[in-house]
């Protein structure tokens, strides 16, 4: 038995889906353990290009079982739409290869509405939410006022529970935001419409994973977002509302804490960020637009242009430490091929003092990047499949990052397709 977590080291959008699609062939099960449809994992394979927001990236591999764990929050309407789009593209999805935890939490339409209402109230102080209802539903979960997927299978129980919750939610919707209340019959009809389609996939995934482990199956745990968006260790409050930490895989999937023995951290060869909050090495203007265009940096979930900049080694080293990464996959190295010189953020300067340490949230916005530059390679590397065939400048860049973050880089992607990578 060998279990692996695939996690983001930075702000998310590092290329986790692409690496899961590559590495998952070594595993029997791929399990998403946190988050909702607020971020997307982009996968390019023989079926086409897909942006997955809930379904694990192992869904394209025959013989691999894909699981949404208890730590995931699920918008029924979105999940069914995602499943249908995959099935329409010829991807097989059955209760045998896709399972949904009965303990996963449902994101209701009123959660989405509350997300938008709160962002509107905050105005220029907003957090940059994706407006998918994630913060409201996790807030409700910890107040024990949410509905679990398994409750869809018990209509009378669901009706009783939802009636009490909706009465409470409408107090906030009406009295705080002055918006129209939600009707119980409408919410029950929504549950029936989409819950009936999803019912065959809902089961006790904790028991399924337990039995799978016991029989020697290998499990991969797929995270959403990255260390700097983690609710505990990220740049608070500009974080997600769940833990994107590798350590949460055990909680969000329901397995013992000692059972993850490999953690692959995903790092992009430059920095990107979607949403608000400090982003120390950020570029602006023509410089940023050139990098954004070269890397096609637009959010998979929102379509928003991503904020971009050079790789930030201070933030990356912190992410490696927080995630406990045992190895690194460096993605999108090919994007930097247009640069004659490649800037690298090696330190921060705060109040005149240079530091290698990632600072506490209260002062991170005051940090200024300290850059060095490295020679570019100036040629297309997307056809390279062996480490020794990379230009020496590209190898030097990878090795410089590896030394700075203190973790071996075992994979280097040089393109979006499944086979466009180098294993060291």
Language model features with spans:
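Non-transmembrane, aqueous-exposed alpha-helical and coiled segments at domain scale
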Residues: 1-424
């Amino acid at each position: 038995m060998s279990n692996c977590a695939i996690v983001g080291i930075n702000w998310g959008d590092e290329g986790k889906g692409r690496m899961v699609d590559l590495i998952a062939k070594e595993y029997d099960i791929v399990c998403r353990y946190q988050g909702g449809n607020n971020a997307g994992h982009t996968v390019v394979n023989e079926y086409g290009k897909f942006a997955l927001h809930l379904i694990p990236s192992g869904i394209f591999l025959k013989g691999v079982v894909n699981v949404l764990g208890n730590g995931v929050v699920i918008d029924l309407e979105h999940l069914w739409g995602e499943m249908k789009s995959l099935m329409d593209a010829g991807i097989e999805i059955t209760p045998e290869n896709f399972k949904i935890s009965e303990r996963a939490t449902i994101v209701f339409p009123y959660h989405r509405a509350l997300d938008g209402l709160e962002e509107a109230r905050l105005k220029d102080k907003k957090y940059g939410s994706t407006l998918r209802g994630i913060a409201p539903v996790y807030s409700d979960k910890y107040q024990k006022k949410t509905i679990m997927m398994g409750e869809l299978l018990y209509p009378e129980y669901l009706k009783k529970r939802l009636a009490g919750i909706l009465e409470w939610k409408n107090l906030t919707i009406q009295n705080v935001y002055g918006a129209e209340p939600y009707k119980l019959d409408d919410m029950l009809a929504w549950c029936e419409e989409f819950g009936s389609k999803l019912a065959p996939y809902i089961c006790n995934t904790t028991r399924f994973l337990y039995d799978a482990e016991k029989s020697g199956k290998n499990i991969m745990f797929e995270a959403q977002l990255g260390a700097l968006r983690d609710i505990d260790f990220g740049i608070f409050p500009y974080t997600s509302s769940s833990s994107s930490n590798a350590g949460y895989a055990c909680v969000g999937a329901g397995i013992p804490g000692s059972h993850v023995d490999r953690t692959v951290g995903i790092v992009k060869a430059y920095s990107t960020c979607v949403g608000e909050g400090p982003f120390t090495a950020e570029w602006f203007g023509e410089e940023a637009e050139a990098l954004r265009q070269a890397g096609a940096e637009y959010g998979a979930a929102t379509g928003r242009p991503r904020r971009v900049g050079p790789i930030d080694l201070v933030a990356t080293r912190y992410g490696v430490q927080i995630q406990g990464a045992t190895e690194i996959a460096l993605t999108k190295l090919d994007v930097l091929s247009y640069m004659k010189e490649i800037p690298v953020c090696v330190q921060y300067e705060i109040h005149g003092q240079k530091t290698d340490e990632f600072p506490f949230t209260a002062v991170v916005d005051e940090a200024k990047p300290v850059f060095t530059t490295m020679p570019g390679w100036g040629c297309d590397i997307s056809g390279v499949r062996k480490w020794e065939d990379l230009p020496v400048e590209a190898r030097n860049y990878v090795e410089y990052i590896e030394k700075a973050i203190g973790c071996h880089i075992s994979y280097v992607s040089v393109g979006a397709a499944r086979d466009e990578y180098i294993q060291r």
